[in-house]
């Protein structure tokens, strides 16, 4: 028989952690907000938080922005290829952070597909038509800071 205290300890260990961060695009003087959520990839989210701020160049692949290799080194964690609109992910194969705001070159039938399996770590929040248009204006090689 468990006590209420034991139940509370268990309950708190399965709660998800959410943290809002900013992604600042230095070359265009703009930013977006991202909510990190460890419900899918808790180890990956913890490594991202420990490495903040992350200052890197960003590249474009269709309607996905992905960073150059980061200092984050994490294995696939509940990794998947099919992602949702505005998902933020970590790409274990490339050591990069990814922002999905539309189809990639390999997407089909309205699905958004990553190049290879990614760990989902959060969402672009407050996404509006303005932010979608803003992300479309980001050029390959732009400097970005996650903080």
PLM features: residue spans?
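Start-of-domain signal
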Residues: 2-55
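Glycine-rich active-site loops that engage anionic ligands at enzyme catalytic sites
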Residues: 34, 38-47, 51-147
């Amino acid at each position: 028989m468990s006590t209420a205290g034991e139940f509370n300890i268990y309950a708190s260990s399965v709660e998800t952690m959410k943290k809002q961060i900013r992604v600042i695009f230095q070359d265009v003087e703009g930013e977006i907000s991202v909510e990190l959520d460890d419900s899918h990839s808790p180890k990956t989210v913890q490594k991202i938080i420990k490495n903040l701020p992350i200052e890197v160049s960003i590249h474009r692949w269709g309607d996905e922005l992905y960073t150059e290799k980061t200092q984050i080194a994490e294995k696939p964690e509940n990794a998947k290829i099919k992602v949702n609109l505005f998902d933020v992910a970590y790409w274990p194969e490339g050591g990069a952070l990814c922002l999905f705001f539309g189809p990639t070159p390999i997407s089909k039938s309205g699905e958004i597909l990553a190049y290879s399996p990614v760990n989902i770590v959060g969402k672009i929040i407050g996404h509006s038509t303005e932010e979608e248009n803003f992300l479309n204006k980001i050029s390959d090689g732009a400097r970005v800071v996650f903080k």
